[in-house]
Structure formats: structure tokens, C-alpha cells
Amino acid sequence: MDKLYAAIFGVFMGSQEDDLTDFIEIVKSVLSDEKTVTSTNNTGCWGWYWLIIIFFIVLILLLLIYLYLKVVW
């Protein structure tokens, strides 16, 4: 078992500290049978979705303004 621990932590020695922290949290949740795992990887996705949605809304508004001005003038 000591060799297993040494191998697991040896992998994370050259890695970022966040990776080790996430790994420890996952191991804790598995050992304690918790259903919630704190993960910071998915929080950035919602920002991209909102950015894409806002981009398309602005694009549609610009198209509608262009068509309106084309008809009025």
C-alpha cells in the first residue's frame, strides 16, 4: 500500500497544486461515500455559453436594425 501512495503522489509532484487538491477531494468523497464533489473545471463553461448567446443576440439585433434602416431610408 505504501508503494501505491508513493506512486500516486509522485505523479502529482510535478503537477499543479490544484490537481493534487482536486484529487484529494475526489478520494475523500469516494472514501466517505459523499455524492457531491467540488470541481472547478466546469465553472468556466457557463461563461462561454453566455458569451455565445449574447454574441448571437447582438448579431440578430444588428441585422434587424440594418433591415429597419434599409426600409425607412
Curated annotation (Swiss-Prot):
**InterPro entries in the record, alphabetically?**
Poxvirus_I2 (IPR009175)
Q: How does it sit in the membrane?
A: Single-pass membrane protein
Q: Name one GO biological process term.
A: symbiont entry into host cell
Keyword tags: Late protein, Membrane, Transmembrane, Transmembrane helix, Viral penetration into host cytoplasm, Virion, Virus entry into host cell
Q: Does the keyword tRNA-binding apply?
A: no
Main localization is virion
Question: One Pfam match, by short name?
Answer: Pox_EPC_I2-L1
Specify the domain of life of the species encoding this protein. Viruses
A GO CC term assigned to this protein in UniProt: membrane
Transmembrane helix keyword on record: yes
Give the stretches traversing the membrane.
49-69
Tell me where in or outside the cell this protein is found: Virion membrane
What family name appears in the similarity comment? Belongs to the orthopoxvirus OPG078 family.
Function summary? Late protein which probably plays a role in virus entry into the host cell.
- Tell me the protein's name: Protein OPG078
* Organism of origin: Monkeypox virus
Upper classification of the source organism reads: Viruses, Varidnaviria, Bamfordvirae, Nucleocytoviricota, Pokkesviricetes
Task: Tell me the gene name.
Answer: OPG078
